[in-house]
């Protein structure tokens, strides 16, 4: 009788444990939500920039595997990004001047409570940059503005821990470039930022948000990149949806072919959020 009772108890505990652990391949939602104002995030949309320029993002990030318990979640996934610089011309023409590619893998872990969560995201990625035919001036048979194509690539590991309370999330980050060309680019990037989704004025249709991201990096000398965005999101606050936003950027260009060029611009855009 005692042996039978132990067997029943063991089976019950096994059932409870298995019910508390959920494993899923290719889940619908990302485990770690993209950091809203961070430039290097999966985006699918476009932004009209001041100065008759346009940024076009065609990017995705997918978790391959996710393991969840009652209040934790671990995931492994992959990233494929392209972000391009276009020039606005008459007759609705937008020649593509420059394009950057990113691909890599990521892992994420978070702990969930009633109103808050904390965790981290780890990424291992490669970026390369190229001029495109829209940068070439057929009239003079040369690249426009005296620019020349140059080799730009970097392989890096990025670590971003974060903490969220209700709609407010703060994060810090460190990126180490273990291989980079050109050599005058520093190997360390320090990052700090936040995003705030104002659920307390959620209309049931959309929610307003603001976000800011700062990166300190070195290209010959230390300099900072500032990225600010504010807008409204339709859909799930912490999931899929569509966003309309104003953004402002100042700092060294995000396009690799212009990596040492300082830029400052405003933009209005739309993005399909993962």
Enumerate the language-model features and the residues they cover.
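Transmembrane beta-barrel strands of outer-membrane/channel proteins
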Residues: 44-46, 78-82, 120-126, 172-176, ...
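Transmembrane beta-barrel domains of Gram-negative outer membranes and organellar outer membranes
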Residues: 20-111, 145
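Solvent-exposed loop/turn segments connecting transmembrane beta-strands
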Residues: 48-55, 70, 114-115, 179-188, ...
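Residue-level signature of outer-membrane beta-barrel architecture
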Residues: 62-64, 109-111, 159-165, 176, ...
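Short loop/turn motifs that connect adjacent beta-strands in outer-membrane beta-barrel proteins
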Residues: 21, 26, 65-76, 112-118, ...
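Outer-membrane pore/translocation modules
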Residues: 73-191, 261-262
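Membrane-embedded beta-strands of outer-membrane beta-barrel proteins
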Residues: 58-60, 105-107, 159, 192-194, ...
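Outer-membrane beta-barrel "beta-signal"
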Residues: 263-274
């Amino acid at each position: 009788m005692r042996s039978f009772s132990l067997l029943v108890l063991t089976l019950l505990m096994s059932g409870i444990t298995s019910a508390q652990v959920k494993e899923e391949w290719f889940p619908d939602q990302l485990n770690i939500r993209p950091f809203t104002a961070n430039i290097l995030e999966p985006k699918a949309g476009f932004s009209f920039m001041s100065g008759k320029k346009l940024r076009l993002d065609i990017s995705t990030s997918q978790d391959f595997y996710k393991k969840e318990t009652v209040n934790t979640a671990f995931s492994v996934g992959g990233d494929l990004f392209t972000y391009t610089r276009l020039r606005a011309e008459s007759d609705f023409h937008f020649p593509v001047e420059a394009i950057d590619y990113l691909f890599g893998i990521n892992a994420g872990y978070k702990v969930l409570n009633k109103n808050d969560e904390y965790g981290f995201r780890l990424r291992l990625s490669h970026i390369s940059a190229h001029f495109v035919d829209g940068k070439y001036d057929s009239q003079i048979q040369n690249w426009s503005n005296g620019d020349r194509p140059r080799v730009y690539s970097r392989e890096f590991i990025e670590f971003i821990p974060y903490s969220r309370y209700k709609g407010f999330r703060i994060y810090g980050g460190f990126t180490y470039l273990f291989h980079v060309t050109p050599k005058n680019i520093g190997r360390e990037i320090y990052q700090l930022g936040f995003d705030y989704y104002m659920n307390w004025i959620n209309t049931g249709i959309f929610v307003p948000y603001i976000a800011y991201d700062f990166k300190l990096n070195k290209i010959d000398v230390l300099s900072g990149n500032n990225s600010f965005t504010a807008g409204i999101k339709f859909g799930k606050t912490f999931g899929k949806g569509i966003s309309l936003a104003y953004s402002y950027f100042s700092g060294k260009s995000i396009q690799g072919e212009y990596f040492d060029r300082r830029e400052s611009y405003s933009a209005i855009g739309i993005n399909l959020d993962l």
